[in-house]
Structures are given as C-alpha cells and as structure tokens.
Amino acid sequence: MTKREKRVVILADTQTHMMPALAREMARRNHNLVLGDARDGLADELIKLGAKVEVVPDTADQTKEDTIQKLVDRAVDAFGGFDSACIRTGTHGIGTIMDSTNEDCRIQYEGNFRSVFYALKALLPPLVEQKSGQIVINTSAAGARVQEWFALYGATRAGANELIHAAGLEAAPHGVTVNGTGTYAMNYPSFLHDVGADTDPAKLKAVTDQLPMRKLCEPEEAAYFVATLIDGHGTFQTAQFFPIDGGWSFM
C-alpha cells in the first residue's frame, strides 16, 4: 500500500475517445492525474475539480518503447509514484488477408500489439514493487469478434487481449490487477467517420440497427465503467477482457 495524500492515475492518450471523460471522472473520484497529450483545456477543467495535474507532451506515438515510461517517470517525479493507469492503444485498419500488405501487417502489429507490450513493461514493475495497483489497457471489441474484413486489426487486438490476460495472472500475486477493455460503436468523431456517419445519417442508423442496444456508446458511459476498474475499490477482478460494445461481440 502507498501513503500518498491522494491516489494518482496515469491516463494516455487524453485527446479523444472516452479518455477526456475518464480524466474528469477520476478527478471526481479524488485522484491526481498524469496525462499524456491532453486535449486543450482539459487540465484546467481537472484542476477546477480539485486535482493536481501533470501533462506530458509528445506521448502520442505508443509504438515507441519509451512513450509510457515518460508518464511513469513524471508520476514518480511529481507524486512519488502512481496507483493506477488506463492506456488507450491502437492503430485502426481494415482489409482481408489477401488484400493486406506486409507493411499493413507491420503497422497493425506495432500499433496494436507491441504498444501494449511496451505499456505493460513500463507500468508493471513499479506497481509490483509497491504491492498494489490497477491497470486497464483499452484495446478493441474487435479482438473478441475477429472478422475477415479487418483480419489484421482483429487478430492483433486479440493477441493484445491475451497478453493482458497473461499480465493479469503474472501480477496478481503481487496485489496488482490488469484488465483489458474494448469499445465498439462509440459516439466520437473517428468512429463516425470510419462508418461514414459523419456525412450520411443513414449509415449511422445502419450501424445502430446491428447492435443489440440499438444505440451508440457515449464516452461518459465507457469512462464510468473503466473508472470503476482503476479507482482502488474493486480489486478482485483481474486478467479479464471487458467489451464495451452494446452486445456486439456476442452476436
């Protein structure tokens, strides 16, 4: 157990997706924060919520071995360490095996698998040493339902989910939990663009009609769920993958 006046959470990246909402939720849950590449104005919002905030720039490229280590180092320098982390990883891509190139394979492997390995290598040692901590790596629900039209993306996400599973088992005897989450159909610009819904509302309906929940996931919904895995209260579930996808991965 640690003796910091407040729990400290590392979040990366906090530009988009559920991550700005997660930062706000963690501040509400009485955490100080170390942020990778924060959205403009986000740090000021968090300070108004009572949090101390450290922003580490130039941490967008998680295929670099030292990217997440920079966040760990800042947490140690500013707060004496950290208690939990959520890292959003990934490089999107579509294509069948026959349509994909060797370069496509390299990009997907580095963005979706190696980035997770680097994150775990940076985050696990200090938490194992202090005998407590929680890690969530956000991958994608695509890893739980690989389809032929996103073969490399789904396969590398699936591999990352299994790496997280192994990390959870490795860290469990040391009081550290490691879990994965994966979203699908989130209401944010990149997803809307990927499905063409940013220019054609009919395409959005085509997506939601295929979901058991018949709606998109709001970033705040996903953030609230993930916050529960890293706020220090629920510390028994580990080595799990939790899809946040409205039931899509079970269809």
Briefly describe each language-model feature range.
Residues 2-34:
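Canonical Rossmann dinucleotide-binding motif of NAD(H)/NADP(H)-dependent dehydrogenases/reductases
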Residues 96-97, 101-109, 196, 203, ...:
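Substrate-binding pocket helix/loop in short-chain dehydrogenase/reductase
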Residues 117, 215-244, 249-250:
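C-terminal substrate-recognition "lid" of short-chain dehydrogenase/reductases
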Residues 120, 156-157:
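Active-site helix of classical SDR
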Residues 125, 169-170, 235:
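Alpha-helical segment proximal to the catalytic Tyr-Lys
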Residues 140:
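Residue(s) in the substrate-gating loop at a strand-loop-helix junction
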Residues 172, 177, 237-239:
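Short, small/polar-rich loop/turn modules that mediate ligand/substrate recognition or access, typified
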